[in-house]
């Protein structure tokens, strides 16, 4: 446990609540103190939906500490069962309930007797896993629970559909452009003549989970959530899965080819022939998606060799690194992720596409790395956007966690062929163009907070005299910040408090020596 004012991945109970509130007619009860119940506000603010967030906080207060929680928790479960009549109630433990060492499973067993709804306890260890790991585990737990229930009742679907069909696993609330990505995936699958059997958890019903084995295969577009469920379905029902993320021209083509190879195992029996999606890939790449053409245009060639930093969750950071390096010829100096639990996979994916790899959940390390590298642009999360503003470096947001700007009302997918167009736009618009630099130089731009050290520390005790300031304005804008930083570094090393023109030249000589 650590105190931080910024976390890339939240505590475990947030992941569980995200999965529970993504399903239709599922209610979550969180056993937590006041302050842990910010999820309702966060989801209501960010997800632009009309429905209320189906989460109730069972508050741990002084009465609970004195008498125990059982009576209160059981009462909350039975009350919500009568009021909302959900299909499922998920009791979510928190760090506080773990510290109190209460037997929440016993509370669930007691409440189940008096409830018409199914009641389960989210099986996550709050001191071992973060938000994304907990979401993955909770989704697998819910799927396992309902498939076991269907098996006991004899209602489990054993036969597969006549036409090729898939389950899309891992689309859920507060995800990065998840709803747009889901629409784009459905459109791509429709073009290929593939039916969508179930989408879980976003908008799915727990009563329909028994239909999951009907599909020919499962699609897991994001590694963070859905992989455990896909592995469980593969083990129990022999269902293959595709975990390649269809981001970028190359990634989407690979995704479609993997689907083709799995479908062709059943196609001769059900369709009487093999399927061939190569003409579709060729048509989309050459004529529908603008990204392949754009990457060969003079506009994109101006970006060749530009230095960038990429940071985010494993799925988006790895895919973005490969798109920038492989499809656009942009130099990725450092690629990083905050998903420490999946570091090995990430390193394997980006190896050879970048100079450095950073795996950390400490935003100060990320900030110091960006300040050291001084890239032309950053591609990261909301935190990297803040860092970019401090350092006056443009940033394109490509990964959660994000703020309201990245829950757009318009159609902005990142997956599929339409996603390639969005990514190309984002990349191009994230760079400050040369002419823009000159125009800002001539006519002035917005006031900016310039950062002049190699870290995000704000301590500085230097004064520049009028002559040195005038000399600084004569230096071209694209190197001015770097020269200012190097001069102050020289002054700091030599104990100089006031910077003059002589100090500037001395710093230049020392640097060239």
Swiss-Prot record:
<dbReference type="GO" id="GO:0016730">
    <property type="term" value="F:oxidoreductase activity, acting on iron-sulfur proteins as donors"/>
</dbReference>
<dbReference type="InterPro" id="IPR000510">
    <property type="entry name" value="Nase/OxRdtase_comp1"/>
</dbReference>
<dbReference type="InterPro" id="IPR013580">
    <property type="entry name" value="LI-POR_suB-like_C"/>
</dbReference>
<dbReference type="GO" id="GO:0009507">
    <property type="term" value="C:chloroplast"/>
</dbReference>
<dbReference type="GO" id="GO:0005524">
    <property type="term" value="F:ATP binding"/>
</dbReference>
<dbReference type="GO" id="GO:0051539">
    <property type="term" value="F:4 iron, 4 sulfur cluster binding"/>
</dbReference>
<dbReference type="Pfam" id="PF00148">
    <property type="entry name" value="Oxidored_nitro"/>
</dbReference>
<keyword id="KW-0479">Metal-binding</keyword>
<feature type="binding site">
    <location>
        <position position="36"/>
    </location>
    <ligand>
        <name>[4Fe-4S] cluster</name>
    </ligand>
</feature>
<dbReference type="InterPro" id="IPR050152">
    <property type="entry name" value="ChlB/BchB/BchZ"/>
</dbReference>
<keyword id="KW-0067">ATP-binding</keyword>
<dbReference type="GO" id="GO:0016636">
    <property type="term" value="F:oxidoreductase activity, acting on the CH-CH group of donors, iron-sulfur protein as acceptor"/>
</dbReference>
<comment type="subunit">
    <text>Protochlorophyllide reductase is composed of three subunits; ChlL, ChlN and ChlB. Forms a heterotetramer of two ChlB and two ChlN subunits.</text>
</comment>
<dbReference type="GO" id="GO:0046872">
    <property type="term" value="F:metal ion binding"/>
</dbReference>
<dbReference type="GO" id="GO:0019685">
    <property type="term" value="P:photosynthesis, dark reaction"/>
</dbReference>
<keyword id="KW-0934">Plastid</keyword>
<comment type="function">
    <text>Component of the dark-operative protochlorophyllide reductase (DPOR) that uses Mg-ATP and reduced ferredoxin to reduce ring D of protochlorophyllide (Pchlide) to form chlorophyllide a (Chlide). This reaction is light-independent. The NB-protein (ChlN-ChlB) is the catalytic component of the complex.</text>
</comment>
<keyword id="KW-0602">Photosynthesis</keyword>
<keyword id="KW-0004">4Fe-4S</keyword>
<dbReference type="GO" id="GO:0036068">
    <property type="term" value="P:light-independent chlorophyll biosynthetic process"/>
</dbReference>
<protein>
    <recommendedName>
        <fullName>Light-independent protochlorophyllide reductase subunit B</fullName>
        <ecNumber>1.3.7.7</ecNumber>
    </recommendedName>
</protein>
<feature type="binding site">
    <location>
        <begin position="434"/>
        <end position="435"/>
    </location>
    <ligand>
        <name>substrate</name>
    </ligand>
</feature>
<feature type="active site" description="Proton donor">
    <location>
        <position position="299"/>
    </location>
</feature>
<dbReference type="Pfam" id="PF08369">
    <property type="entry name" value="PCP_red"/>
</dbReference>
<dbReference type="InterPro" id="IPR016209">
    <property type="entry name" value="Protochlorophyllide_Rdtase"/>
</dbReference>
<comment type="similarity">
    <text>Belongs to the ChlB/BchB/BchZ family.</text>
</comment>
<keyword id="KW-0149">Chlorophyll biosynthesis</keyword>
<keyword id="KW-0408">Iron</keyword>
<keyword id="KW-0547">Nucleotide-binding</keyword>
<keyword id="KW-0150">Chloroplast</keyword>
<keyword id="KW-0560">Oxidoreductase</keyword>
<dbReference type="InterPro" id="IPR042298">
    <property type="entry name" value="P-CP_red_C"/>
</dbReference>
<keyword id="KW-0411">Iron-sulfur</keyword>
<dbReference type="InterPro" id="IPR005969">
    <property type="entry name" value="Protochl_reductB"/>
</dbReference>
<comment type="pathway">
    <text>Porphyrin-containing compound metabolism; chlorophyll biosynthesis (light-independent).</text>
</comment>
């Amino acid at each position: 446990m650590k105190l931080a004012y910024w976390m890339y991945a939240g505590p475990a109970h947030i992941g569980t609540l995200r999965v529970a509130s993504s399903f239709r007619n599922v209610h979550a009860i969180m056993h937590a103190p006041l302050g842990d119940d910010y999820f309702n506000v966060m989801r209501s603010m960010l997800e632009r939906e009309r429905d209320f967030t189906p989460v109730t906080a069972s508050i741990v207060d002084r009465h609970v500490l004195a008498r125990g929680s059982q009576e209160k928790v059981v009462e909350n479960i039975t009350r919500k069962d009568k009021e909302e009549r959900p299909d499922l109630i998920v009791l979510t433990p928190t760090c506080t309930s773990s510290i109190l060492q209460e037997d929440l499973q016993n509370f669930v067993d007691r409440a189940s007797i008096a409830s018409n709804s199914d009641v389960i306890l989210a099986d996550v260890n709050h001191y071992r896993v973060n938000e994304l790991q907990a979401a993955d585990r909770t989704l697998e737990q819910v799927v396992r629970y309902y498939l076991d229930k269907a098996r006991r009742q004899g209602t489990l679907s054993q036969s597969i559909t006549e036409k090729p069909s898939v389950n899309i696993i891992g689309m859920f609330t507060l995800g990065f452009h998840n709803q747009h990505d889901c629409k784009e995936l459905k459109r791509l699958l429709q073009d290929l003549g593939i039916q969508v059997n179930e989408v879980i958890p976003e908008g799915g019903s727990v009563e329909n989970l028994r239909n999951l084995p009907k599909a020919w295969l499962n699609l897991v577009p994001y590694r963070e959530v859905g992989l455990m469920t896909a592995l469980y379905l593969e083990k129990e029902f022999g269902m293959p899965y595709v975990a390649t993320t269809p981001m970028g021209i190359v990634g989407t083509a690979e995704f479609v080819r993997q689907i083709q190879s799995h479908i062709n195992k059943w196609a001769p029996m059900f369709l009487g022939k093999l399927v061939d999606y190569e003409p579709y890939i060729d048509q989309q790449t050459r004529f529908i998606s603008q990204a392949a053409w754009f990457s060969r245009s003079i506009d994109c060639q101006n970006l060749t060799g530009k230095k960038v930093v990429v940071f985010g969750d494993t799925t988006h950071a790895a895919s973005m690194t490969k798109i920038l390096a492989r499809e656009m010829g942009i130099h990725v100096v450092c690629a990083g992720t905050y998903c420490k639990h999946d570091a090995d996979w990430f390193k394997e994916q980006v190896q050879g596409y970048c100079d450095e790899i950073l795996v950390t959940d400490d935003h100060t390390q990320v900030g110091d790395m960006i300040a050291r590298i001084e890239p032309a642009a950053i591609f990261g999360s909301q935190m990297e956007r803040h860092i970019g503003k401090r350092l006056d470096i443009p940033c394109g947001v490509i990964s959660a966690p994000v703020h309201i700007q990245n829950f757009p009302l318009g159609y902005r997918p990142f997956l599929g062929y339409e996603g390639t167009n969005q990514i190309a736009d984002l990349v191009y618009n994230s760079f400050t163009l040369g002419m823009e630099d000159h125009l800002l130089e001539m006519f002035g731009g917005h006031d900016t907070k310039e950062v002049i050290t190699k870290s995000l520390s704000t301590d500085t005790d230097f004064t520049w005299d009028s002559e040195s300031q005038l000399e600084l304005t004569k230096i071209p804008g694209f190197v001015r910040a770097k020269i200012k930083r190097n001069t102050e570094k020289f002054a700091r090393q030599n104990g100089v408090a006031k910077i003059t023109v002589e100090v500037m030249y001395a710093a230049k000589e020392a640097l060239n020596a």
